[in-house]
């Protein structure tokens, strides 16, 4: 099969828990809804592969030590390309957050934009 599609969804039924130390409700630091979809191509004829991935992460409350606040929902698109030169050498290019949507995944952490990674892999 040259083309394949994959989809996933997760639902978290709770968004807070009773902290036994403070005896107060704390956020669980995770989104209620997450979903993803992947369209993948694996050529039978040529030594190439590729995929386009989409991810959605729902907004949620965050609390950890001195850091607390809201994580805004975000949608990201990723691209992965691979080329097999021979039985011993492969190259992979991954572009995460293709559209450079600046977003925060944890309160107190940096905003994350596009990340590109080129990997050469050898086997022997």
For the regions a language model picked out, list residue spans one by one.
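Gram-negative outer-membrane beta-barrel transporters
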Residues: 1-61
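Hydrophobic core residues within well-ordered beta-strands of beta-rich domains
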Residues: 3, 35, 48, 75-77, ...
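C-terminal beta-signal and adjacent terminal beta-strands/loops
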Residues: 55-63, 70-72, 79-124
């Amino acid at each position: 099969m040259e083309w394949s599609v994959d989809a996933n969804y997760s639902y978290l039924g709770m968004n807070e828990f009773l902290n036994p130390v403070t005896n107060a409700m704390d956020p669980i630091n995770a989104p209620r809804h997450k979903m993803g979809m992947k369209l993948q191509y694996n050529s039978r004829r040529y030594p190439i592969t590729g995929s386009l991935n989409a991810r959605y992460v729902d907004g949620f409350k965050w609390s950890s030590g001195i850091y607390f606040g809201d994580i805004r929902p975000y949608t990201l698109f990723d691209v992965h390309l691979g080329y097999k030169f021979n039985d011993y050498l492969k190259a992979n290019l991954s572009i995460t957050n293709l559209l450079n949507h600046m977003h925060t995944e944890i309160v107190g952490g940096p905003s994350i934009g596009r990340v590109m990674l080129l990997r050469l892999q050898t086997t022997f």
